[in-house]
């Protein structure tokens, strides 16, 4: 489940959103790795408070280069956030969010995208409401065939969490997504289980073994198949500026990552993916990422 602060002294606190259930375990598997990519991320902030984020990556297998540019401005007095996005597919995006103004805990977001090359447009209205013991979300994705409604709810009490997520496609007049999740968390241990559409079953465990070592286990199984997916991952903080990550799954894919803070605002990540079943056959992947922030 998600890391969202230490447990409350009171029996009630704000649970994470449905998308963030199990996030602590997923982060151990995903962060610190970038197989098959050479990536550069740059973040900076102007004197007027405008935040700029640029990202570029090159796929070492295909040679394809992709990039994104994002600008964000927060008008704190009115709880407004304006975001502009662009990517190398020439898709433009605009997002306007207002939070804690209509009522405490309510956030409304208006999100639009436009592709000049194809003329394709999309729009989405997103809302979330979080208070003690509850976190609700409802998004409406507009489409010419008919809007799709995405809803989610998470309830929490004394460390226990229960969540539900659905998608209703008005064009087909039926539910296209129907997910359930149950979990439990304490300060250094988190357990999460989920059922997606009644066919996919999954679970994850996050454990902070000590101050410098985090571990994670995940398991997934799809009904109607004999395929079970299993993985173990760990992250160890070597010192305040360096960490090493490792993971392995039941397909004998072994991933290793090393992250080093070269100086404040400059972070380098090196990673490698090795196929344990065919070590001498090649096909292994390397990754390099550099993050700059000022």
Curated annotation (Swiss-Prot):
Protein residues bound to NAD(+): 253-255, 271-275
Recorded catalytic activity of this chain's protein: chloride(in) = chloride(out); K(+)(in) = K(+)(out); a 1,2-diacyl-sn-glycero-3-phospho-L-serine(in) = a 1,2-diacyl-sn-glycero-3-phospho-L-serine(out); a 1,2-diacyl-sn-glycero-3-phosphocholine(in) = a 1,2-diacyl-sn-glycero-3-phosphocholine(out)
Q: Which GO terms describe its molecular function?
A: ATP binding; ceramide binding; cholesterol binding; oxysterol binding; phosphatidylcholine binding; porin activity; voltage-gated monoatomic anion channel activity; voltage-gated monoatomic ion channel activity
Q: Is NADP tagged as a keyword?
A: no
Modified residues annotated as Phosphothreonine in this record = 118
Q: Report what the Swiss-Prot or TrEMBL entry states about this protein's PTMs.
A: Ubiquitinated by PRKN during mitophagy, leading to its degradation and enhancement of mitophagy. Deubiquitinated by USP30.
Per the UniProt record, the source organism is: Oryctolagus cuniculus (Rabbit)
Family named by the database record: Belongs to the eukaryotic mitochondrial porin family.
UniProt entry keywords in alphabetical sequence:
Acetylation, ATP-binding, Ion transport, Isopeptide bond, Lipid transport, Lipid-binding, Membrane, Mitochondrion, Mitochondrion outer membrane, NAD, Nucleotide-binding, Phosphoprotein, Porin, Transmembrane, Transmembrane beta strand, Transport, Ubl conjugation
Task: Using the record's annotations, give every residue carrying the modification N6-succinyllysine.
Answer: 31
The entry's protein name is Non-selective voltage-gated ion channel VDAC2
Oligomeric and partner information: Monomer, homodimer and higher order oligomers; formation of higher order structures is necessary for scramblase activity. Interacts with ARMC12 in a TBC1D21-dependent manner. Interacts with KLC3. Interacts with SPATA33. Interacts with PPP3CC in a SPATA33-dependent manner.
* Keyword presence, Metal-binding: no
User: For this UniProt entry, which segments traverse the membrane?
Assistant: 37-46, 50-58, 65-75, 80-87, 91-100, 106-115, 122-131, 134-141, 148-156, 161-169, 174-186, 189-196, 200-209, 213-222, 229-238, 242-249, 253-262, 265-274, 284-293
| Residues modified as N-acetylalanine | 2
Q: Which residues carry this modification: N6-acetyllysine?
A: 31, 120, 277
Phosphotyrosine: which positions carry it? Answer: 78
Tell me where in or outside the cell this protein is found: Mitochondrion outer membrane; Membrane
Site (Involved in ceramide and phosphatidylcholine binding) at: 85
């Amino acid at each position: 489940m998600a890391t969202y602060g230490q447990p409350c002294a009171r029996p009630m606190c704000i649970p994470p959103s449905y998308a963030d259930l199990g996030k602590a375990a997923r982060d151990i598997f995903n962060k610190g790795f970038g197989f098959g990519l050479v990536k550069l991320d740059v973040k900076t902030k102007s004197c007027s408070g405008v935040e700029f984020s640029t990202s570029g990556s090159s796929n070492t297998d295909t040679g394809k280069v992709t990039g994104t540019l994002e600008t964000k401005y927060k008008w704190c007095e009115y709880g407004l956030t304006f975001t502009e996005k662009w990517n190398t597919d020439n898709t433009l995006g605009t997002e306007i969010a207002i939070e804690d103004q209509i009522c405490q805990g309510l956030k409304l977001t208006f999100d639009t995208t436009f592709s000049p090359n194809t003329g394709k447009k999309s729009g989405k209205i997103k809302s979330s409401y979080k208070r003690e013991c509850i976190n609700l979300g409802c998004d409406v994705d507009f489409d010419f065939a008919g809007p799709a409604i995405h809803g989610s709810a998470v309830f929490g009490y004394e460390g226990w969490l229960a969540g539900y997520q659905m998608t209703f496609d008005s064009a087909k007049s039926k539910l296209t997504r129907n997910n359930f999740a149950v979990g439990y968390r304490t300060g250094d241990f988190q357990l999460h289980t989920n059922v997606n559409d009644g066919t996919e079953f999954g679970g994850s465990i996050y454990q902070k073994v000590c101050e410098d070592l985090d571990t994670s286990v995940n398991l997934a199984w799809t009904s109607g198949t004999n395929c079970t997916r299993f993985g173990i991952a760990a992250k160890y903080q070597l010192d305040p500026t360096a960490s090493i990550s490792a993971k392995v799954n039941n397909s004998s894919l072994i991933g290793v990552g090393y992250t080093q803070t070269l100086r404040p605002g400059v972070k380098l990540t090196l990673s490698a993916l090795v196929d344990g079943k065919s070590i001498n056959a090649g096909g292994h992947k390397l990754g390099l990422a550099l993050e700059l922030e000022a």
